[in-house]
């Protein structure tokens, strides 16, 4: 994991972070409990002016990122400044999240857009592990 400061990051219990996370924590980054962070995810809080003169002054500014509980960020996801991702969301691999994602959403793409809402009834038998039988 690579961080800017390391002081502005809170990670909830049971969260798994894979290889290559970049967390630019100029502002607060909050990651909920029981999240799964895929490889090479970027959490980017810094913001920069578009206008040349203010940008040349190198003033540091940032907007916080909030990730709810039980969120899965697929590999290579980029979360932009000021974004909140609600609880129980799945963000598809390679997505660029530029706006808030409501609780229980499946979002994909660049920019990420919500495809549908998720709940326990969404998942059929192929998503459940069968009970293990003990050999006789």
Residues covered by each model-derived region:
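Short-chain dehydrogenase/reductase
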Residues: 72, 90, 96, 106-108
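C-terminal catalytic lobe of FAD-dependent flavoproteins
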Residues: 134
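Flexible, glycine/small-residue-enriched loop-and-beta-strand segment within the central core
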Residues: 1-11, 16-84, 110-112, 116-129
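Conserved catalytic segment of ABC-fold P-loop ATPases
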Residues: 86-89, 102-104
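Short glycine-rich donor-binding/catalytic loop of glycosyltransferases
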Residues: 94-95, 100-102, 111-112, 118-119
């Amino acid at each position: 994991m690579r961080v800017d400061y390391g002081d502005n990051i809170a990670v909830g219990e049971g969260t798994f972070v894979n290889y290559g996370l970049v967390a630019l924590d100029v502002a607060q980054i909050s990651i909920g409990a029981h999240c799964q962070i895929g490889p090479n995810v970027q959490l980017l809080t810094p913001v920069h002016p578009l206008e040349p003169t203010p940008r040349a002054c190198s003033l540091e500014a940032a907007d916080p990122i909030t990730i709810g509980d039980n969120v899965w960020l697929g590999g290579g996801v980029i979360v932009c400044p000021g974004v909140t991702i609600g609880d129980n969301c799945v963000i598809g691999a390679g997505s660029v999240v530029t706006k808030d994602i409501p609780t229980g959403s499946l979002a994909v793409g660049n920019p990420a857009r919500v495809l549908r809402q998720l709940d326990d009834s969404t998942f059929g038998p192929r998503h459940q592990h069968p009970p293990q039988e003990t050999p006789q």
